[in-house]
Amino acid sequence: MEITMELLRELTQDDKKMWVIGGSKVSSENSSKGIKEPEVSGKYVTIEADNWHCHLDLDLVTGIQFVVAESHGDMHSYYVRFSGPEFEDTLVRTYFPNPSLDNNEKRVDFQPEKVTAFEEFRDRYVGREGIEFVERPRQTS
């Protein structure tokens, strides 16, 4: 639980990430505008921003992965995934800004500094308490 909270605290320090709550069955994409430091009460952590919040049962977080996933065309997504008891059970994902998109979600030339932020996080956490790095190919229908 300590590594989970350490990572959540660090991820909530900037409001340029997108938080996706839930997994394959139901999910909610949320801006991190106004995100606050997480608050712990018992086994639950509350993550809150200007227009949303969620309560995560820390006991359900059984895995953390730093993921680079092929997404649309030649673009990649960079995120941290908190998984549940079943590995495919995604609880929360935190997406770093896409290096191929500007702040208005318009396609631009690749911005390597956006990948650097992800890589710095990854390099600090992967290997600690079972945290993994995963590269995912594009999902086919």
Model-derived regions: residue spans:
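Acidic, Ser/Thr- and proline-rich intrinsically disordered linker/docking segments
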Residues: E2, L11, I64-S141
